[in-house]
Design a protein with these regions (language model features):
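Residues on the lipid-exposed face of transmembrane beta-strands in outer-membrane beta-barrel proteins
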Residues: 69-75, 113-118, 172-176, 376-380, ...
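Repeated loop/turn-to-beta-strand initiation elements of outer-membrane beta-barrel proteins
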Residues: 31, 79-83, 124-128, 181-184, ...
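Outer membrane beta-barrel
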Residues: 78-222, 639, 643
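Transmembrane beta-strand segments of Gram-negative outer membrane beta-barrel proteins
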Residues: 24-50, 83-85, 606
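Outer-membrane beta-barrel "beta-signal"
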Residues: 151-154, 592, 653-666
Length: 666
């Protein structure tokens, strides 16, 4: 496997070099060991509830208490090679489970780096770095465009430095200088994906199902990474305890079980003439006027108690801890849609027959360790001062996608079929929309395998809604350039740009019409798109030594979908509370970055970056490093998020925080 091969290669070279080193002294004498011991503690600076959290926090509550060691070890590997290792034990006592300590392929990986530097070819013209490492291609402030060789750990959004948040992977990194002065770089690397709170490789893959006899809730506490301060709404929609459809699906299955026998004695399959909205909008008097079968004891008992349709629905849904039905009465049902049954308003009760005792399951279809990503870059500096690079990679896209499907026995895929029926005002079937007495139509969903075997209560077979996490290959073609211009008033101004065209990446596409009839697998689909992203920046130095950098950033979705209720959703913020937030076709960001040393010997430094996001999201980070001496450094950082709550930054307003740290260098 790829990673084991790399480990073996690095270790073998180091071991082979030991006798050579031993000729001049002990192995340990030849090692260079340095490092840093650091503690960072953070508090919330705003009371509130972070996305998906079960309860609110108060201002000044602890967010983080992380102690870590970064140990750097360098040694010789033969006469012309060297090896390097970075080891980082870490513990955060305030983190949620899964984030407290070591985690492979994350920011807290115990073995951050392990590689060998050597040369090959005639006159050692090719420099090789083999092993676990980072390769940095992009230099934009606050975001990554060309910097896509390594994945990123977004456990603290963009607060951590690029060096800290970048996830090292195993790779072969080869560079050589060409005759015209250009530098050619080839990277063959292990494919790994970005890591987000709530969307990673630690999600429980056991099927989630409630009691199939009495509908008892057996899936409580199933939210992934609940309480993490940097959970985003888009992730909460997938794996969140309350709003995540991974956990909503089995609860819908249990509510459907409760419906059985309530509308007809024979079950739900024949109830094609009533939708969720029709039922929930009924007053108590309207319900009381309808005939109910003798088996409908739950409904008739509630009617006798004065309940309307929404209140009866809440009696069924209230037994579960997910966001099934937020309305409180027939008067406010779906006035503002923010719960599952409000979005599934056109689903018939016959559709719920297919959902009876449904389960859900999270699965992974990720690249194996024998798969590789490939990237090549050529960069050059011209005599006129222009520096540029041309970049290409064919890699698994770093952002994971989620594919939904219904599954049956032996993992067979089920096909949803929509059937339209027409009715008169009394709910009796009519032949079509043009016949006398026609009043309304409904669409009923059924599930069956390729052999025609139906699933549902009548069939006696329960389906499973699968959430499959995967990544897909994409082509990335990019360029970076910078050029210094001397001006009379501002001095030297560095103009720079990064440009990236991505082919065959994926976007989440939401279809609210499909969701309204309960066709969940067609409601959220991942579809191919092409994107063009770029950053234009300018850097100047003012007030003797203060660096000022301004950036304009745009992400253009070249296959954006905006067709009424069928649209490209914003992956970061799509949520039941905002109509699954439609994405911008051309998303823009603006940033300003300031950096200045201070002190008698300019030994301290402060930095400030502020980013403005289209539609009103804002983030500002102010940080200071204060050197008490050469070994001891104090750190201060304040991160403030604010603005529209349905933006990437604005949704994190309750996560605003202040951090204090102390770092000892040895």
């Amino acid at each position: 496997m790829f990673n084991k091969t790399m480990v073996a290669t690095g270790v073998a070279i180091a071991v082979a070099a030991m006798p050579v080193v031993a000729e001049e002294g002990s192995f340990m004498d030849e090692l260079e060991i340095s490092g840093e011991l650091k503690n960072e503690s953070a508090i919330f600076t705003k009371s509130g509830t972070t996305v998906g959290a079960a309860s609110a926090h108060d201002n000044r509550d602890m967010l983080k208490s992380e102690t870590s060691i970064r140990l750097f070890v360098n040694g010789l590997a033969g006469e012309s090679s060297e090896w390097h290792a970075e080891i980082r034990p870490v513990r955060d006592t305030q983190a949620v489970d899964g984030y407290k300590g070591h985690e492979n392929y994350s920011q807290q990986d115990f073995l951050r780096e392990l590689y060998v530097d050597t040369t090959a070819g005639e006159d050692d013209a090719v420099s090789l770095r083999i092993g676990k490492q980072q390769v940095v291609w992009g230099t934009a402030d606050g975001m990554k465009l060309l910097d896509i060789i390594n994945p990123t750990d977004y456990r603290e959004m963009a607060q951590n430095s690029m060096d800290e948040s970048r996830i090292p992977v195993w790779m072969v990194n080869a560079e050589t200088d060409l005759e015209d002065g250009s530098n050619l770089q080839l990277v063959i690397s292990q494919p790994r994906e970005n890591v987000f709170a709530g969307l990673n490789r630690n999600i429980n893959t056991v099927a989630r199902v409630n009691n199939t006899t009495n509908g008892g809730d057996l899936t409580t506490g199933s939210g992934h990474d609940q309480g993490h301060a940097f959970m985003m709404k888009g992730v909460d929609t997938i794996t969140g305890k309350t709003n995540g459809f991974l956990n909503i699906a089995p609860d819908i299955g249990s509510v459907a079980l409760g419906f059985s026998g309530q509308f007809t004695a024979a079950g739900l399959q024949g109830t094609t003439n009533m939708t969720v909205a029709q039922f929930q909008k009924m007053t108590n008097a309207q319900l009381n006027a309808r005939p109910w079968p003798a088996s409908a004891t739950s409904i008739t008992g509630a009617i006798a108690g004065g309940s309307d349709g929404t209140q009866i629905m809440n009696a069924f849904a209230g037994n579960y801890d997910t966001n099934l039905n937020a309305a409180t009465s027939a008067n406010d049902y779906a006035v503002v849609k923010d719960s599952a049954f409000e979005y599934m308003d056109n689903a018939t009760f016959a559709t719920f027959d297919a959902f009876v005792n449904a389960s859900s399951q999270y699965t992974y279809d990720m690249p194996s360790d024998s798969d590789v990503d490939a990237a090549v870059r050529i960069k050059r500096s011209l005599d006129n001062g222009l520096n540029y690079s041309l970049n290409y990679s064919y890699n698994y896209d770093k952002n994971p996608i989620i594919n939904l499907s219904w599954r049956g026995a032996n993992d067979v895929e089920l096909t949803p079929t929509e059937t339209i029926n027409h009715f008169n005002g009394a709910g009796a079937v009519v032949a079509g929309t043009g016949v006398a007495g026609y009043a309304y139509s409904t669409t009923t969903l059924t599930l069956a395998d390729s052999g025609g075997q139906a699933y549902g209560a009548v069939a006696g077979l329960a389906p499973t809604l699968r959430f499959e996490q995967t990544v897909e290959r994409a082509h990335n073609i990019g360029s970076a350039m910078d050029y210094a211009v001397d001006t009379e008033s501002l001095g030297a101004v560095v103009l720079r740009g990064e440009f990236l065209y991505q082919k065959d990446v994926y976007q989440p596409v939401m279809n609210l019409d499909k969701l309204s009839i309960g066709n969940l697998t067609e409601a959220l689909k991942m579809e191919q798109t092409n994107r063009f992203k770029y950053v234009l920046g300018a850097d100047i130095t003012v007030m003797t030594n203060m660096m000022v950098s301004a950036q304009f950033i745009q992400d253009r979705n070249l296959d954006h979908i905006d067709n009424g209720n069928n649209f490209t959703a914003d992956y970061a913020t799509m949520h039941m509370t905002n109509g699954f937030n439609k994405a911008e076709e051309n998303k823009e960001f603006y940033s300003l970055f300031f950096s200045k040393p201070f002190g008698a010997e300019q030994q301290h430094r402060w930095n400030n970056i502020i980013m403005f996001e289209e539609n009103g999201g804002k983030w500002n980070r102010f940080d200071v490093e204060y050197s008490f001496n050469d070994e001891l450094i104090g750190m201060f950082e304040y991160d403030k998020y604010w603005g529209d709550e349905n933006t990437q930054f604005g949704q994190l307003e309750a996560s605003s925080n202040l951090q204090l740290g102390l770092k000892y260098i040895f």
